[in-house]
Amino acid sequence: MAPLLNTGLVILPLIVSTLLGPMPAFAQNETCATKGKPAGKVLQGYWENWDGAKNGVHPPFGWTPIQDAQIRQHGYNVISAAFPVILPNGTALWEDGMDANVKVATPAEMCQAKAAGATIVMSIGGATAAIDLSSSSVADKFVSTIVPILKRYNFDGVDIDIEAGLSGSGTIGTLSTSQANLVRIIDGILAQMPSNFGLTMAPETAYVTGGSVTYGAIWGAYLPIIKKYADNGRLWWLNMQYYNGDMYGCSGDSYKAGTVEGFVAQTDCLNKGLVIQGTTIRVPYDKQVPGLPAQSGAGGGYMSPSLVGQAWDHYNGSLKGLMTWSINWDGSKGWTFGDNVKGRL
C-alpha cells in the first residue's frame, strides 16, 4: 500500500480541485467510518469471493458484487466477506482472482454498500483457509498483514470462522498453544482498529456445546475464547453453526441438526451458561445470532422457512438475529431464507 502524503502537503488536493474542478465521487468515497455494532436486529449472510455458479455448486446465482442492491433488498444488513487467502507463513491476501470473473470490492464500493445499510465484517478461516495456530510468528505475520487490509477496505469488524487447527488443553483455565495464538491474533487486530470495530465468531457446535461431553481437542475449544470476549464486552455476538452434524446441549444431550428442538436446546444452553470444570461460559440471547443453511445443499441440517419461523418466533424477539451460509446460496434459489427472516426481524 502506498504511503500517505506528508501532512505538509495537504493543500495539494485543494490545488488540484481548484485547477481541475471537483474530484469525482469515487475519489471522495475511498474511506468511510467504522460503523460499530448494529443497534437493531441483524440478518447476517456470508458473501462468497468465488463463483459458485461457474463451478456448479449453486447455479444460476454465483459471485455478485458486494454492493449488489439485491442483498439489502432481501433483508441482509450484515455481510461477512469470506474469506481472505492465508499463506503458510501467515500472510493474508485479499485480492482478485479467486475465480476469473471474481473481484473483491474496491474501498469505494465497500463504502457504497455501507452507505446503503450494510455492516461488513471480514470472515477469517472457513473450511479451506486455515492458519497455523501452533506458531506465534505465523500469528504475528497474519496480524501485520490483515490489519492494513481491514483499514484499506473499510471493514467494520472481523468474524472468526476458524475450523481447523484449534484444540483445547483439557483444562478450561489453561489455554493451549493454538488457543493462545488465536487470542494473540484477535487482540492484535483489535488493538490496532477503532474502539467500535466489531468481533463475531462462527464456530461449529463441536467447538462450543461439544464441550459438555468432554473438554479437550476440538470439543469446546472455542469456549475460553468466547468467554474472554463475551465477558470483556468486545464480542458483538456469536454465530454458532447449527448445521453439519448432531448438536449437543448443556448436559451432553444430543439433537439432530435441522430441528426446532435442537435449535432451542442449543440456544437455551448458551443463554443459561455452559459449566465446564466449574467455569461458566454464558452467551445471552441478545448476543446470539444462530447460523443456519440458506438452502438445501448449502449445509446439513437445512430448515424449511416454516421451521426457521418456528425457531425464531419461540424467542419472541429476544435473539439478536440470524446468520446464514450463504447470501449466494440464497440468491441461487429465490432468496427464500432472506425474505422469510426479513419479515420477522
Swiss-Prot record:
Coiled coil regions, renumbered to chain: none
InterPro entries: Glyco_hydro18_cat (IPR001223), Glyco_hydro_18_chit_AS (IPR001579), Glycoside_hydrolase_SF (IPR017853), Glycosyl_Hydrlase18_Chitinase (IPR050542)
Name of the top EC class for this enzyme: hydrolase
Record flagged with keyword Cell division: no
Cellular compartment(s): Secreted
EC annotation from Swiss-Prot or TrEMBL: 3.2.1.14
Cysteine pairs bridged by disulfides in the record: none
Occurrences of domain GH18 (ranges): 41-345
Molecular function, one GO term: endochitinase activity
Sorted UniProt keywords: Carbohydrate metabolism, Chitin degradation, Chitin-binding, Glycoprotein, Glycosidase, Hydrolase, Polysaccharide degradation, Secreted, Signal, Virulence
Residues annotated as signal peptide: 1-27
Family to which this protein belongs: Belongs to the glycosyl hydrolase 18 family. Chitinase class V subfamily.
Keyword Glycoprotein: yes
Protein name: Endochitinase 4
Job description of the protein: Secreted chitinase involved in the degradation of chitin, a component of the cell walls of fungi and exoskeletal elements of some animals (including worms and arthropods). Participates in the infection process and directly acts in the penetration process of the host cuticle.
Glycan-carrying positions: N29, N89, N316
Record organism: Metarhizium robertsii (strain ARSEF 23 / ATCC MYA-3075) (Metarhizium anisopliae (strain ARSEF 23))
GO cellular component: extracellular region
Catalytic activity: Random endo-hydrolysis of N-acetyl-beta-D-glucosaminide (1->4)-beta-linkages in chitin and chitodextrins
Pfam family, one: Glyco_hydro_18
Entry annotation: catalytic residues: E163
UniProt superkingdom: Eukaryota
